[in-house]
């Protein structure tokens, strides 16, 4: 999976198309990520004694990575990303449009 925690992404498909946010958590096994403020769902919770109140809670749901594009920090555009190996053997991600190393 090419998206990591704290990446800025743009939603390119679905009900939140056009929104941007930061990746809060990545689920590599299912190719999904949790993005701040995007794909909000409502959960109904029951009261558990005096500690937890009953009510409707809004929270983010994971999105599939195919519906997201990384926002390049150099060219400030949504970009396809690739990976390449540096001379020292370290693998890094790079923006395919401006050819800059992302991390």
From Swiss-Prot:
GO cellular-component term (any): ribonucleoprotein complex
SUPFAM superfamilies in alphabetical order: Translation proteins SH3-like domain (SSF50104)
Gene Ontology annotations of biological process type: translation
Origin superkingdom: Bacteria
Keyword RNA-binding: yes
Keywords linked to the UniProt accession: Ribonucleoprotein, Ribosomal protein, RNA-binding, rRNA-binding
Keyword Magnesium: no
GO molecular function, one term: rRNA binding
SMART domains, sorted: KOW (SM00739)
Listed CDD domains: KOW_RPL26
Quaternary context: Part of the 50S ribosomal subunit.
Protein family according to the UniProt entry: Belongs to the universal ribosomal protein uL24 family.
Functional summary from the UniProt entry: One of two assembly initiator proteins, it binds directly to the 5'-end of the 23S rRNA, where it nucleates assembly of the 50S subunit.
Name of the protein: Large ribosomal subunit protein uL24
The organism of origin for this protein: Dehalococcoides mccartyi (strain ATCC BAA-2100 / JCM 16839 / KCTC 5957 / BAV1)
